[in-house]
Structures are given as structure tokens and as C-alpha cells.
Amino acid sequence: MSMSDPIADMLTRIRNAQMVEKAVVVMPSSKLKVAIAQVLKDEGYIDAYAVKGEAEKPQLEIGLKYYAGRPVIERIERVSRPGLRVYKGRHEIPQVMNGLGVAIVTTPKGVMTDRKARAAGIGGEVLCYVA
């Protein structure tokens, strides 16, 4: 059976792995998941990520980050989902926790944070909030 929302599955795997203090979480890979992992790494929410395995079924490994025994990611939640897509224009992209968190947005120029999308003057689909 196929998965209906692979991005929600990715976020849930990260959330669950951090609750049990795992160092690494493994999941099926896709181009969009790798792009989201790159944004999380650039923003300092994860240590590293790598795509491993054979070409037919690549696996994405994400190294989770902790500070003083607590997960760096306090909150990670899906916004746009298959049943209700959430698109925002360049002036409507929300701030997360008054700028302390990030919204990950997929735009025509690629996957980026809310700050970069606002600076570039482009809108897109709001995938998730991370704080």
C-alpha cells in the first residue's frame, strides 16, 4: 500500500525519534525530503543527512541534534497536506514564533525558509513549521 502523505511521515519519524532520543532516523528518500533536510541542516535543526542504499530504494538518514539533553526541534508540524493545500503569496507567508522558528516553503525557485522566500519576493506552498 502506498503512503498518502510522505512529508507528514517524515516529520512524524523525526518527532518520534527525538522523543526517544535516537541519534539517527532512517526513512525512504525522495527529492523533496532531501530538500527539506537541507533546509533543516542550514537552519541548524539537524546535524547531518545522507542518502544511502541502492538506486531503486534509497534511504534518507538524518542525524538528530540535541542541546543540553533536549531536542533542538521543539515543534515540527505539517501545514499543507494532500486534502488541504496551503498556498501563500509573498506578502502572506507567516512568521513562526515571531521569527524564532521557520516555515518551510516550496516555491518555483525550490524549497526554502519563509525568510528567504520573503526576501526573494516569491510565495508558494507552506509545507511545515519548525521551532
Curated annotation (Swiss-Prot):
Ribonucleoprotein keyword on record: yes
InterPro entries documented for this protein: Ribosomal_uS8, Ribosomal_uS8_CS, Ribosomal_uS8_sf
Short name of one Pfam family: Ribosomal_S8
Protein's UniProt keywords contain rRNA-binding: yes
Gene Ontology biological process: translation
Molecular function terms, GO-annotated: rRNA binding; structural constituent of ribosome
This protein's UniProt keywords: Ribonucleoprotein, Ribosomal protein, RNA-binding, rRNA-binding
Domain of life (superkingdom): Bacteria
Example of a GO cellular component annotation carried by this entry: ribosome
Subunit record text: Part of the 30S ribosomal subunit. Contacts proteins S5 and S12.
NCBIfam families, per the entry: PRK00136.1
Known role: One of the primary rRNA binding proteins, it binds directly to 16S rRNA central domain where it helps coordinate assembly of the platform of the 30S subunit.
Family label: Belongs to the universal ribosomal protein uS8 family.
UniProt name for this protein: Small ribosomal subunit protein uS8
Gene designation per UniProt: rpsH
